[in-house]
């Protein structure tokens, strides 16, 4: 398959710069095999599910992973910006840095040195240990563990997606907006955005309707924003992300499905993790590892019956995933409908509920 097969025209004004308020007021496009599209709202979700169904939530928490700093080398100083990608050890992170060409192994970087909010921790300094492709580097920080986490939290900014960050600056409101209400496990540098639509009230209404929720963790990396650069999509390589499905959760998911319940993943992150944890037999097993699963049309889904997901960008791996899940022709038609009827796209945009083709 070619990258051009997943292209479509998306007006710039369709990209949402702020989320709906309240969260569950966002629109929801229902896509069912062989049925007309239905224009609803996220708050209608309890009426679209039935008792015994399970919503799988990604409980990762976004950290303020964008850091500005200065690279020093033999007296020269260059302003740089890092977006942390994945933690490798207590003091080691991989990151995407700009300008990557101005960095080399051994360089020292001081982050937030003009920002005195975290002075009590000392300087947030790091050494470039390795340099990869596309601006990816490995940083070894002088601080480690909780001290490093606190310094990043004080000095970092929320890592808004590029299409939003190019149009406005991150602000204090994003610290709340770009976080799900059920986030618990620190580690993501991008939000699992389908989950942003949930409110405590909506979760309570779902529970009253007999819909259960299960929590898994996938720490979303900055690689989720990277464009596909290969014309043949089979040549694209995903960045690995760490995830966990514990044994008790796996058992409950298997039992619910055996009893006739449908497994509905809230977001592509939950879906990719669940598919990584499931065997060819469809049984979900405990999983605690990295996954670089790349789902494209032709993939045979094992563990998920439904998917709630926002509207994705042209030629993105996530648009390829929804085409695999609900059918390429169906999703191209659904996206045409969404654009023509004013749905808002991307991380702060509206949502869809897809049933597997």
Curated annotation (Swiss-Prot):
An example GO BP is: tRNA wobble guanine modification
Tell whether Transferase is among the UniProt keywords. yes
Q: Quick one: where is this thing mainly located?
A: cytoplasm
Q: Provide a GO CC annotation, any one.
A: cytoplasm
Q: Catalysed reaction(s)?
A: 7-aminomethyl-7-carbaguanosine(34) in tRNA + S-adenosyl-L-methionine = epoxyqueuosine(34) in tRNA + adenine + L-methionine + 2 H(+)
Enzyme nomenclature, EC number? 2.4.99.17
Q: What top-level branch of life does the organism fall under?
A: Bacteria
- Which InterPro entries does this one have? QueA (IPR003699), QueA_dom1 (IPR042118), QueA_dom2 (IPR042119), QueA_sf (IPR036100)
What the entry lists under SUPFAM superfamilies is as follows: QueA-like
- Could you tell me one molecular function GO term of this UniProt entry? S-adenosylmethionine:tRNA ribosyltransferase-isomerase activity
Pathway, per Swiss-Prot/TrEMBL? tRNA modification; tRNA-queuosine biosynthesis
Q: Which UniProt keywords apply?
A: Cytoplasm, Queuosine biosynthesis, S-adenosyl-L-methionine, Transferase
Q: What class of enzyme is it?
A: transferase
The protein's location, in the record's own words, is: Cytoplasm
Q: Which PANTHER family match?
A: S-ADENOSYLMETHIONINE:TRNA RIBOSYLTRANSFERASE-ISOMERASE
Summarizing the function annotation, the protein's role is: Transfers and isomerizes the ribose moiety from AdoMet to the 7-aminomethyl group of 7-deazaguanine (preQ1-tRNA) to give epoxyqueuosine (oQ-tRNA).
Give the family, as the similarity comment puts it.
Belongs to the QueA family.
Cited HAMAP family: QueA
The entry describes its oligomerization and partners as:
Monomer.
| Designated name of the protein | S-adenosylmethionine:tRNA ribosyltransferase-isomerase
- What is the scientific name of the source organism? Phenylobacterium zucineum (strain HLK1)
Q: What is the lineage of its organism?
A: Bacteria, Pseudomonadati, Pseudomonadota, Alphaproteobacteria, Caulobacterales
**Gene this chain is encoded by:** queA
């Amino acid at each position: 398959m070619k990258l051009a097969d997943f292209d479509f025209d998306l007006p710039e004004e369709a990209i949402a710069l702020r989320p709906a308020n309240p969260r569950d007021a966002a629109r929801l496009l229902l896509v069912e095999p062989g049925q007309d599209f239905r224009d609803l709202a996220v708050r209608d979700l309890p009426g679209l599910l039935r008792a015994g169904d399970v919503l799988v939530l990604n409980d990762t928490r976004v950290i303020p992973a964008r850091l500005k700093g200065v690279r020093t080398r033999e007296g020269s100083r260059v302003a740089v910006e890092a977006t942390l990608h994945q933690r490798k050890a207590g003091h080691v992170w991989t990151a995407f840095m700009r300008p990557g060409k101005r960095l080399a192994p051994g360089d020292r970087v001081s982050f937030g040195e003009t920002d005195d909010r975290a002075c009590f921790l000392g300087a947030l300094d790091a050494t470039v240990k390795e340099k990869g492709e596309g601006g990816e580097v490995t940083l070894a920080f002088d601080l480690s563990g909780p001290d490093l986490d606190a310094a990043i939290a004080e000095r970092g900014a929320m890592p808004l997606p590029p299409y939003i960050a190019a149009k406005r600056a991150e602000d204090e409101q994003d610290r709340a907006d770009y976080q799900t209400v059920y986030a618990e496990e620190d580690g993501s540098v991008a939000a699992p955005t389908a989950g942003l639509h949930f409110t405590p009230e909506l979760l309570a209404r779902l529970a009253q309707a007999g819909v259960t929720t299960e929590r898994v963790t996938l720490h979303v990396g900055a690689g989720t924003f990277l464009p596909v650069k290969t014309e043949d999509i089979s040549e694209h390589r995903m960045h690995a992300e760490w995830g966990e499905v514990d044994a008790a959760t796996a058992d409950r998911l298997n039992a619910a499905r055996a009893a006739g319940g449908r497994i509905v993943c809230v977001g592509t992150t939950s879906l990719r993790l669940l598919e990584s944890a499931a065997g060819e037999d469809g049984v979900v097993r405990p999983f605690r590892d990295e996954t670089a699963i790349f789902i494209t049309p032709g993939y045979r889904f094992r563990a998920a019956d439904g998917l709630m997901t926002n509207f994705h960008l042209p030629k993105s791996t996530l648009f390829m995933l929804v085409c695999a899940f609900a059918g390429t022709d169906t999703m191209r038609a659904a996206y045409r409908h969404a654009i023509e009827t004013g749905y808002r796209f991307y991380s702060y945009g509206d949502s869809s509920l897809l049933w597997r083709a």
